[in-house]
Amino acid sequence: MPTTHQLPEPVIAARANLLMQHPFFASHLLTKQRIAFVPETPTAKTNGKQITLGDWFSARPLPQRVFVLCHEVLHDILGHMDRARMYTARGFGPDMNVFDTTRWNKATDYYINSILTASKIGIMPAEGLLDPRYDHSLTA
């Protein structure tokens, strides 16, 4: 696992911005999650314990990097990974034996992006999922 001095400057700058501008997210990031840098990571991802970032993240302007870091932290704060594991193990839905992880991830992304954009935390990348039809109607 990379340590702070092994992370590229764009990652360190985004983390420093969180410390100064968004201490709630920074405290969670610094105490509950690790950051790994894997250049070929297509966007960003988390398993609830580690956030994996790559060249895609580094190429973004700082406000987008801040948004993405807060997005990944919120997945953990809101328990999305834990609930996905539980639903996968138990089953979920009308037939109680199928859980669609892709659909779950998209739904939680819509929810998180709605929170972050309404709170004016960073700037969501163009690839982000956001639809005003879902504002205030999701409970992920």
List where the protein language model places each region.
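Short, functionally important secondary-structure microenvironments
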Residues: 1-66, 73-140
